[in-house]
């Protein structure tokens, strides 16, 4: 029996299936940055500091392991790698019923929503296929693109998670980022599993997820799995 089937069988007879709160495929540099400085429409992941070996290309060098896989959702031509990296890319939508993201992940605007034509980075068919809750202090009405509905909420992590779990209808909730949002949910101790892909680059400045991943080991088990692509997959799950 697979782990998935065991979980499904255990849920039979329970009033409510356990819903996990998950971070998946979250990319950081070796020095712990998930985005560079100065994020904008032209540079969604910001810019890296200049290093002796040159300047990292963002997001290319940070997330190239995912772009290169056969299961990358934006792939327009046949091909791509299989193996460990592809497994994580392919696993991204499994049992996810809702996502929570920060406003910075949704788009580059700050303050009041002046440009309502902006509907995210993802075009007419976003890759989420679930309700998405965008954390913001400014009101904006919900809207749908294909099978994804974006809701804009001014809420602390606990309340945002309550709404997302209700919308997920028994499935898991993904904390999608950006960096500040993942940090907030870690600080609130609301995350059950965390997958971070550490790229073999340094960014030097910007938004930092951690100074050291070892700071999480009082709360999480850790398995570190290197990939032939050069990234190291860090898999955390609650103690």
Predicted regions located by residue number:
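Enzymes that bind and transform nitrogen-containing heteroaromatic metabolites
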Residues: 2-239
């Amino acid at each position: 029996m697979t782990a998935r089937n065991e979980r499904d069988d255990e849920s039979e007879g329970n009033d409510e299936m356990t819903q996990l709160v998950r971070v998946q495929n979250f990319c950081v540099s070796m020095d712990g940055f998930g985005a560079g400085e100065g994020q904008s429409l032209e540079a969604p992941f910001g810019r890296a500091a200049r290093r002796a070996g040159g300047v990292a290309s963002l997001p290319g060098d940070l997330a190239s392991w995912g772009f290169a896989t056969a299961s990358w959702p934006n792939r327009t031509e046949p091909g791509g790698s299989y193996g460990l990296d592809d497994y994580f890319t392919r696993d991204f939508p499994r049992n996810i019923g809702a996502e929570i993201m920060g406003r910075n992940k949704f788009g580059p605007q700050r303050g009041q929503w002046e440009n309502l034509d902006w509907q995210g980075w993802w075009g007419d068919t976003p890759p989420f296929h679930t309700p998405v809750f965008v954390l913001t202090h400014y009101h904006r009405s919900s809207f749908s693109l294909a099978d994804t509905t974006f809701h804009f909420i001014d809420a602390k992590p606990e309340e945002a998670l309550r709404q997302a779990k209700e919308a997920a209808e028994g499935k898991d909730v993904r904390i999608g980022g950006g960096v500040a949002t993942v940090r907030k949910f870690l600080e609130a101790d609301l995350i059950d599993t965390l997958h971070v892909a550490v790229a073999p680059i340094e960014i030097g400045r910007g938004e930092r997820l951690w100074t050291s991943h070892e700071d999480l080991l009082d709360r999480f088990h850790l398995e570190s799995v290197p990939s032939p692509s050069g990234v190291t997959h860090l898999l955390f799950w609650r103690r």
